[in-house]
Amino acid sequence: MKQLLPIGVLALVLAGCGAAPERQTPSDELRDETPEVVAEREWQRRASSGRETEGEALPPVLRDGTLYIADRRGRVSAYKAESGRLVWRFGTGEAVSGGPGVDDDLVVVGTRKGRVRAFESPDGEQRWEARTSGEVLSVPAVGENYVIVRGNDGRVYGFDRDSGSRRWVHDVSVPSLSLRGNGDPLLANGQVMVGFENGRLQALGVDGGELRWDVTVSEPRGSADLDRVRDVDANPVLFGGALYVVGYRGNVMAINPANGQVYWDRELSSHAGLAVDDERTYVTDDRGRIWALDRRTGAAIWRQNDTEGLQPTAPTVHGDRIVFGDNRGRLTVLSAQDGRILARIRVREDVTISEAPVSDGNGVHVLTDDGYLMRYRLRDRNDD
């Protein structure tokens, strides 16, 4: 049985070092300056059943102006991102642990018992069901011909999109001790990119699951099992012709997605994840600090230290700002240019925000672990 790394251990892990201008301000309880950004809540909905046994919300997915939410009790819902209007909701009849993966007319979820279930959108009629050998903790990737599913035991499955028949399986040996959770498979340009608990990122052919290339993101350190944990759990990001990835106790890298060539790499440990814009790569490290790196070289531009210890989510790019949630139920807004804190918004009391906010370019959507989904519009205070 897979063992789980206690969350308290994460606070003891040091991220990679590097020179960068540091932004440091007092905690929100002590700050008395006026925030530079004002957040207006446009709507709020009770979108999911909220915290259950292991606690975290499942990530919301934005597609074509609609937000898709699954909860661990098996409900799947769709909301209009701008208005918050409920478009549809249906029950899967089973505890959901991964998803939803969404395409034009298909919603796919994974379950704790290793089932993959595909439903018609919007009526919720089940199209097919397939089996994997273990719990599904990531979001299935839904493509034109295939649904790609990452199992919790190192296997990656390619299922026929229309029938659910298994076309291929790729098996990777993974260590028994790792972080709980898996990065989502990324489907693009005829291949699927997947990170594993052994510290490697692989690209597989989407038609047959054959290995295209393999890159080491995180190397094992020390002799004790705990010291050798090295998961690649953060979701890879494809941007501007490069693939960006970061590993726990490893590196942040820019990779050529065609052949696995490493453009640049930098020692930096993260399990939360990263985001990318035209100029910079933003990373939440394992101490909770937020970094901005030059997208083309990996050179450090700034680092915000005031978030240390708050378990911030992966960053999300929202125009010229960076937004993320934390374990105090807050949405924090940073300047993308220099990392200064523009605002901290109390979303809800005594809750955690485990999943990164979702931006549609106009509004920022936040899902709390107790199941509340809300949309904020951000504006400069001097626009009043």
Language-model features, listed with the residues they occupy:
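C-terminal motif of bacterial Sec signal peptides marking the signal peptidase cleavage site
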Residues: 14-16
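Extracytoplasmic beta-rich repeat domains
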Residues: 21-28, 34-61, 88-103, 126-143, ...
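Structural signature of WD-repeat beta-propellers
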Residues: 71, 111, 151-152, 196-197, ...
